[in-house]
Amino acid sequence: MIMIKIGQGIDVHAFHNNGQQQQYVVLAGVPIEHTHSLLAHSDGDVVLHALADALLGALALGDIGQHFPDTDAANAGLDSRVLLRYVYGKVLAAGYMLGNADITVMCERPKLAVHNLAMRANIASDLQTDVSNISVKATTTEKLGFTGRQEGIMANAVVLLVPNTSGV
């Protein structure tokens, strides 16, 4: 019997005016110009944080806060792609690999459609898979809630892990 694993992760960060003239948010490792940055201990990449939590959850390995606590100064400003590659190393070490990932970003702004392929390509590269196995979608909450008021951004990720038969 083939044992597949499914994981789900969610991450939220508040928008923050950092006082800089040019501000941006980082989503799936892609810097995107915006009116605000994100308030976070690391780079605040909600896409990669949700994805990393989904990968860890599929294997019951806790969450990114346990592996990268915000109380550790070494994690300040951490590039979330480094975090994701570390987590994926744990997936490979457990004998699994990514089947596919489906990620939804919830925000009114910034608009993400023009960044979709770059986000998917970064994730595919970090997870050693084809871009066709990575879905990134964006939606609004029709001006409802904290995302609708443009106070923050949220991402939800679902992953399917399959036994690693590739020898990687």
Curated annotation (Swiss-Prot):
Described purpose of this protein according to its UniProt entry: Involved in the biosynthesis of isopentenyl diphosphate (IPP) and dimethylallyl diphosphate (DMAPP), two major building blocks of isoprenoid compounds. Catalyzes the conversion of 4-diphosphocytidyl-2-C-methyl-D-erythritol 2-phosphate (CDP-ME2P) to 2-C-methyl-D-erythritol 2,4-cyclodiphosphate (ME-CPP) with a corresponding release of cytidine 5-monophosphate (CMP).
Family affiliation: Belongs to the IspF family.
Keyword Metal-binding: yes
Record's protein name: 2-C-methyl-D-erythritol 2,4-cyclodiphosphate synthase
Protein species of origin: Psychrobacter arcticus (strain DSM 17307 / VKM B-2377 / 273-4)
Residues binding 4-CDP-2-C-methyl-D-erythritol 2-phosphate, per UniProt: 11-13, 41-42, 63-65, 68-72, 139-142, 146, 149
Catalytic activity: 4-CDP-2-C-methyl-D-erythritol 2-phosphate = 2-C-methyl-D-erythritol 2,4-cyclic diphosphate + CMP
Cofactor: a divalent metal cation
Site keyed Transition state stabilizer: positions: 41, 140
Pfam family, one: YgbB
Binding positions (a divalent metal cation): 11, 13, 49
Highest taxon listed in the record's lineage: Bacteria
UniProt keywords, alphabetically: Isoprene biosynthesis, Lyase, Metal-binding
Annotated NCBIfam families: ispF
